[in-house]
Amino acid sequence: MRNRPLLSVCLIILCVLTSCTLVGKERFIKELRPSPLEICTTEDESVIVCGVIYRQEQKENGQMIYLKHNSVYSISNKQKFQESKIIVYINSKEKLHIGNRIKVRGTVSFYENARNPGNFDQKFYYQKQGIHGKIYGSQMQITDKSVDVFREKLAVFRAGWKELLVREMGEREGGVLAAILLGEKSDMDPEMKELYQVNGIGHILAISGLHLSFAGLGAYRLFRRLTGSYKAGGLAGGMLLFLYVSMIGMTVSVLRAWVMFLFRVGADVTGRKYDMPTALSVAAVIAVGSNPLYLYDGGFLLSFGALLAICTVIPLVKEESQQPVLVRILGPGIAMNCVLWPVILYFFFEVPLYSVMLNLLVIPLMPVILSCGMAGSLVRMAGGTYGTWILMVCSRILKLYDGCCVLLLKFPVARWIAGRPEKWRCIVYYLMLSGIILIWKYMDRQPVKIRKKYMASLALYITAWLILISGPLLRRGMEVTMLDIGQGDCICVQGPKHQNYLIDGGSSDVKEIGKYRIEPFLKSRGIAQLDYVFLSHGDMDHMNGIEELLMRQDVGVRIRNLVVPGKQYWDERILKIITMAKMYGTDVKEMEYGTELKEGEMKFTCLGPGGNTDDKSHNVTTGNESSMILHLEYGEFDMLFTGDVEKEGEEMLTEVLDVIREEKKITWEILKTAHHGSKNSTTETFLQTVYPQYAWISAGRKNRYGHPHDLTLKRLEKSGAKIYSTQDNGAVAVTVRKKTMWIHGGNS
């Protein structure tokens, strides 16, 4: 530190910035404060926006236009104000250019925070970019045809380069190489992207120091040799790198690599030694100083964390000379993973256990991909047919990556889903890891002390690791979470003996509900396997997410058993999902009236369909009226899950509940309100029998059915039940331990 004054200063500045960010929040970070658009307008309000285009993307149904320097006019309150950045979605094929000023008439919409634990936080993602709202445009007019020639030319060149790669290599491999070379992931095959991520090689899709080394250091060294001048080489490399960075965009990893490149070249030009820790600290100060929200960004933490591992931990591993060959090969990769594990688990909830070995193949071949990709593209742009052959090398390597990823997922324990650790566990982990680094760095190298060093380090690391991952393992009691999945139903039950259950899972207004809402929630809770998935009936808003989960078991969550109502209540959709479950290795079980499923003190009992005393069940058809009804008991806690039951089905259920209440003197703490709060369900007679303390309603915001219905809400209020709705609360959860229970937001 005494020989690195700039490093010391940067660390102090980082500590100050971090403290201000954590304590000051919106007082210190302007991006967290409401923007004029949020203050002056409301959701779906009509406005007229006039702004300058700084970026645009072509979508299947129109264009996505990024505007800056915006003037916004609210039509309803006749108010005009300024907004720094806005995104416009419009179904128009009109040719636009960067720098054009356009006027758009449309409706305002705001980004949402994550509605469930583990879900993508769209609002925070755009806040980091200084964007607080979007406009769905109906009319558009170009008011100024001025063009930012420099950025427009780069955008056209980038788009043309991407088209060339896709044309020459095909959509799958071409899309991957476009992501690697250009940072363009919007049209990349989602399955390919996910395959890389779950295998621990998603980092190759991020523009990093390796890319800038080829673009910048390659040119720098070439021109330095040609001219014999460090300054000329540095200037040429810097100019080429500036063009490349301007084309791909200044992401946080690009910013880090750009600053470190300047330090590298600057050290050569001035005849000084390049110091990676100092360059890294300066890059961190610039990044956090320009946008403090990077401190909460997974990309920032992974990018800088990987370089921090290279500076601190990996040198300690390499300096031990008397090591087995396998340790020397795998040691650096394992050491880096040890540094990054808390970040990986916090943002992705799982660790690919074979990633170290896979990266031994992937990383050495990356220079080949970059050099052949850039060279082949340039030759092909110049009209040379040899460019196609050069690009074929990249295609073969990417197919090798693909095959290895698919193969490794078939290996036992390929992925370890540990869940999202609490922040305090991450802090303790890093404090103990720092202790290990100090032990290795400063303990004397006498043989006896070396053995003590190994033992102390191992004991300390095992303790740190157990603290990091033990959250889900130490969970006590039972927890029930009603997920917000829009217009649909999905409830997760985590039992006292660590078995996991899902009751329904589907939505009629949210696409890919299994992949983007249910699965991330399960993984964030450390749920790698669902022991039982109950399907109440065959409506798609209760089952399409379950179908996704069944198909995604290789990269998602395993499902042991699918539980369906008795055969007499099956329809075509239930038959279809049963066939699908068997095809993907999931057992199928029927649950008839009176069937019980126990886990310790917790018990599920099926109360329908088919439980009436007058044998009316023969008149009940498939569908809502024959929904599976479940009674959950845990100690003195009782909860009723009613699916979409209504009409005759609810009448029969009321008769059953009357008998149970008289025999067992049961009161239900929570009722999962049937059919999303439809007026045809949850009658006064039914509520007089159940008399719940709390009523949970799962319904989509602004749904076309008007759920929950006002009459249903009035009946619930009249019964004395306190209402929790996913529309208002997002995910809702209840935790039960012994004789205590508390309801809280699912994100808490």
What spans do the regions from the language model cover?
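Start-transfer (signal-anchor) and selected internal transmembrane alpha helices
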Residues: M1-T21
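Hydrophobic alpha-helical transmembrane segments in multi-pass membrane proteins
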Residues: V9, D189-V356, C372, G419-R475, ...
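Membrane-interface helix/helix-cap signal primarily in integral membrane proteins
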Residues: C15, T21-H203, K515-P520, Q529, ...
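Non-globular, low-confidence helical/coil segments that flank catalytic cores
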Residues: Y73-S74, S92-T107, F124-Y126, I131, ...
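Aromatic-rich juxtamembrane segments at the membrane interface
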Residues: K128-M260, V265, C338, Y532, ...
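Hydrophobic alpha-helical segments of integral membrane proteins
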Residues: F150-M169, V176, E184, M192, ...
